[in-house]
Curated annotation (Swiss-Prot):
GO molecular function: alkanesulfonate monooxygenase activity; uracil oxygenase activity
Taxonomic lineage from the root: Bacteria, Pseudomonadati, Pseudomonadota, Gammaproteobacteria, Enterobacterales
Protein name, entry field: Pyrimidine monooxygenase RutA
NAD in keyword set: no
Organism of origin: Yersinia enterocolitica serotype O:8 / biotype 1B (strain NCTC 13174 / 8081)
EC number: 1.14.99.46
Binding locations of FMN: 49-50, 115, 124, 140-141, 190
Entry keywords, A to Z: Flavoprotein, FMN, Monooxygenase, NADP, Oxidoreductase
GO biological process, one term: uracil catabolic process
């Protein structure tokens, strides 16, 4: 089972709460996080892109770094962990993204991959005059399909004459090409998004569901497998979970209850408002799940709350879901969370036993 870290490119990570750790994003923080993750043999690090936050008293996600430049820096200070940046495809022409990807591929010596997003939060793009109109909600995966086909031209031959509805290339060239194939990922849950991932992506990210219900996302993984079979490809799921762990279940639960009690209601109201803007894509989109009031304080990603031993067991349960190749992790406190994961959770996981055996001595004292 592969393990990755969803690094906090925006302020306060993924907890919309005044009772959660409050911090600004910085290169130094993310460098420490990714180097620590590499030390504990995490397989990859991913950063999102966010161009406008939710506001509220915590100013949630009002302060964000940029994904490609951050990951280029992190590629230069790591040696093994895979590095994924996110392209907000409405803001960056595919020829520029192809060249930036080739550059980070060079910096990382072949460790770079790309996450592509269509854009769901209208104010992010409207503020720059880049929103193409609300009809885009129903056409966004048509747009993204052309975008990726252009990328594939550049990474395959270094040249494109693509002529589509959204993109037209005229002997456009990108060189040098990547030294290794660029892995492409998407985070899709709608039917249109699943069809896109099945046709174009190497991996598809999905949300975990609920609190301490590690296999509840299984129907989503099954939908991807069905779509991939129809497309004649193999595409695996990577699932997003937040870990809130401590020495005992009671201590971990107390932290979770405190975070919920401090929920930033103004920021959450903004999220709910934005989730209703897309009336075209149906009820199964990521943003619909993010805004569900059940656990909106951490945008409704799956949450594992408990002792180190119980979290390890739930992580192993995730690994049993067919079609699941990896887990993307966030933490309430990233530095202490990764340390506790490496020292107290990973050594107890059957699904990471092969990794524990390869850790440096200082990282497997409890194994």
């Amino acid at each position: 089972m592969k393990i990755g870290v969803f690094i906090p490119i925006g302020n306060n990570g993924w907890l919309i709460s005044s009772n959660a750790p409050q911090y600004m994003p910085s290169f130094e923080l993310n460098k420490a996080i990714v180097q620590q993750a590499e030390h504990y043999q995490f397989d990859f690090a991913l950063s999102m892109i966010k161009l406008r936050g939710f506001g509220g008293k915590t100013e949630f996600w009002d302060h964000n770094l940029e994904s490609f430049t951050l990951m280029a820096g992190l590629a230069a200070v790591t040696s093994r962990i895979k590095i994924y940046a996110t392209a907000a495809t409405l803001t960056l022409p595919p020829a520029i993204v192809a060249r930036m990807a080739s550059t980070i591929d060079s910096i990382s010596n072949g460790r770079f991959g790309l996450n592509v997003v269509t854009g769901w939060q209208k104010p992010e793009y409207e503020q720059m005059g880049l929103w193409p109109g609300d009809e885009y909600f129903s056409r966004r995966y048509d747009y993204l399909s052309e975008y990726v086909e252009v990328l594939q031209d550049f990474w395959g031959t270094g040249q494109s004459d693509f002529n589509g509805e959204f993109f037209q290339m005229d002997d456009c060239r990108v060189s040098p090409q990547p030294q290794t194939p660029i892995k492409l990922i998407c985070a899709a849950q709608s039917d249109a998004g699943m069809a896109f991932s099945a046709k174009y992506a190497d991996y598809n990210f999905c949300f975990g569901k609920g609190v301490n219900t590690p296999t509840a996302f299984a129907p989503t993984a099954a939908r991807l497998q069905k779509a991939a079979e129809q497309a004649g490809r193999e595409v695996s799921s990577y699932v997003l979970f937040m870990i809130i762990a401590d020495e005992t279940d009671e201590l971990a639960r107390a932290k979770w209850e405190s975070y919920k009690a401090g929920a930033d209601t103004e920021a959450l109201a903004w999220l709910t408002e934005q989730s209703g803007k897309d009336t075209q894509s149906g009820a199964d989109t990521n943003v619909r799940q993010m805004a569900d009031p059940t656990s909106a304080v951490n945008i409704n990603m799956g949450t594992l709350v408990g002792s180190y031993a119980n979290v390890a067991k739930m992580m192993d349960d995730i690994a049993t879901v067919p079609g699941t190749e990896g887990i993307l992790l966030t933490f309430d406190d990233f530095l202490s969370g990764i340390e506790n994961f490496g020292q107290h959770i990973q050594p107890l996981m059957n699904s990471r036993a092969d990794i524990v055996d390869t850790l440096p001595p200082a990282a497997r004292e409890v194994a």
